[in-house]
Design a protein with these regions (language model features):
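Small-residue hinge/turn detector
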Residues: 63-75
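Glycosyltransferase-associated regions of secretory-pathway enzymes
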Residues: 1-63, 78-283
Length: 283
């Protein structure tokens, strides 16, 4: 099983938090190969795109890359800022189960899948369908949707997205997302994709649309082992909510999931990189 990751300027130039995360993946998974790609690798792998891939922000290019890699090779995708707390073999089979696919997810009522950590067996039907959908979406370069500009999006959609960004998480977010689902998915709809703008979470929305329209894709996701994506953000959430006192919450936060998503721009204290006892970590 290959473990894929990406840092645009190369692993050797990555910031300290990224270096620590990547090294931890190697240390914990000696039976598996960690492949860290850079901008040149990406350009080669995505050379069949119908436009210069470098016209897109690096985050969008990385979104395309991860699905392409998993379609071609199978394996696991891990964001470079994803801190592992357990060896992959401890939970990979549990997570992929009979579907051969796993992504952390939001509430099943709207099936918003995260893409910061993905596992897919070679030839997995969901990944194949998603890669096909991505190719169909990126027929031309688009500009990242910026709330400060007036895009070709209908004004109502602009207000909807702004409201979403102020809702936060929890029940308010869930109610809002359920009510405005069609509007949020507008950019990847047949009409919305004719424009020249795309939202930051375009790939997550495209996965949701795929689940809505492709019975086979939906069956895979509904049979997938369910783990809520919020469990992977407990360390970051603690830092945002508790400020300097968050360090006291770190031991508990680290036990919530086999992986924790970090922000590479933050100077994380050493407590964040301390390993809890394996048996205490939720799988």
């Amino acid at each position: 099983l290959d473990i894929f990751s990406f840092w645009d300027s190369g692993r050797q130039n990555a910031p300290a938090a990224v270096q620590t995360c990547l090294s931890r993946w190697e240390e914990m998974n000696p039976e598996h190969r960690l492949v860290v790609l850079d901008a040149r690798d990406m350009a080669d792998l995505l050379s069949d795109m119908p436009f210069d891939i470098n016209l897109l922000p690096v985050q969008a290019r990385s979104d395309i890359l991860r699905v392409r890699l998993l379609r071609q090779h199978g394996g696991a995708w891990v964001d470079a800022t994803l801190l592992p707390l357990l060896p992959l073999d401890r939970y990979a089979d549990v997570y992929t189960g009979k579907t051969g696919f796993f992504a952390f997810a939001g509430p099943p009522s709207h099936w918003r899948l995260g893409n910061f950590f993905l596992i897919a067996h070679a030839g997995n039907a969901f990944i194949r369908a998603l890669d096909d959908a991505i190719r169909a979406y990126w027929t031309h370069p688009r500009q990242l949707y910026d709330l400060r500009i007036q895009p070709t999006w209908p004004p109502g959609k602009k207000l909807t997205i702004r409201a979403l960004l102020t809702k936060g998480m929890g029940k308010g977010y869930l109610d809002f997302f359920t009510r405005w689902r069609a509007d949020l998915l507008y950019p990847v709809s047949p009409l919305g994709r004719q424009g020249d703008y795309f939202p930051y979470f375009w790939e997550q929305y495209l996965m949701m649309q795929l689940i809505d329209t492709d019975p086979k894709a939906r069956a895979i996701v509904e049979a997938m082992t369910y783990r809520h994506h919020d469990l992977c953000h407990m360390v970051q959430n603690a830092r945002e909510h508790f400020g300097p006192d968050f360090v006291r919450t770190v031991p508990m936060a680290l036990r919530c999931s086999p992986v924790q998503k970090l922000d590479w721009r933050v100077d994380w204290p050493p407590e964040v990189f301390a390993l809890p006892a394996e048996e205490s970590i939720l799988i």
